[in-house]
């Protein structure tokens, strides 16, 4: 876990399988009161989510935050678009990277840091099927090598 990263509430585990993560950026999320209560209860799904930049602002799209059970009329739409809090320089850098390169912004994890909800956004390029097979093959080979080295070291 990176320095300052507190309690991880949600992870997009398949993101590293489906994408080559080039760079990561930490961003704050603008949430309503009932949404932060649901996030603290770890009722958030990042699976279909992505981030986009519109008019110089970063937005988190398709991230599902379940309605808070005691929220009643104050609950917001679970799939609403949420604003990300980034510095203007960071937004400009990400916008430059996204222009015409086949890159996308993918939420990797949501966690609490000093009481605030943060999202780790990855600048990613999609993997092809053969890239995924290569990753699996490489992981299996590394596992076999570790297994053999472990048995050799025991002798």
From Swiss-Prot:
Record-linked InterPro entries: SmpB, SsrA-bd_prot, SsrA-bd_prot_CS
Pfam families: SmpB
The keyword Cytoplasm appears for this protein: yes
Record function comment: Required for rescue of stalled ribosomes mediated by trans-translation. Binds to transfer-messenger RNA (tmRNA), required for stable association of tmRNA with ribosomes. tmRNA and SmpB together mimic tRNA shape, replacing the anticodon stem-loop with SmpB. tmRNA is encoded by the ssrA gene; the 2 termini fold to resemble tRNA(Ala) and it encodes a 'tag peptide', a short internal open reading frame. During trans-translation Ala-aminoacylated tmRNA acts like a tRNA, entering the A-site of stalled ribosomes, displacing the stalled mRNA.
NCBIfam families on file: PRK05422.1, smpB
Gene of this entry: smpB
Membership in a protein family: Belongs to the SmpB family.
Protein name, entry field: SsrA-binding protein
Sorted UniProt keywords: Cytoplasm, RNA-binding
SUPFAM superfamilies: Small protein B (SmpB)
Species assigned in the record: Streptococcus equi subsp. zooepidemicus (strain H70)
Source superkingdom: Bacteria
Subcellular location: Cytoplasm
Gene Ontology CC terms, in alphabetical order: cytosol
One GO BP annotation of this record: trans-translation
Source organism phylogeny: Bacteria, Bacillati, Bacillota, Bacilli, Lactobacillales
GO molecular function: RNA binding
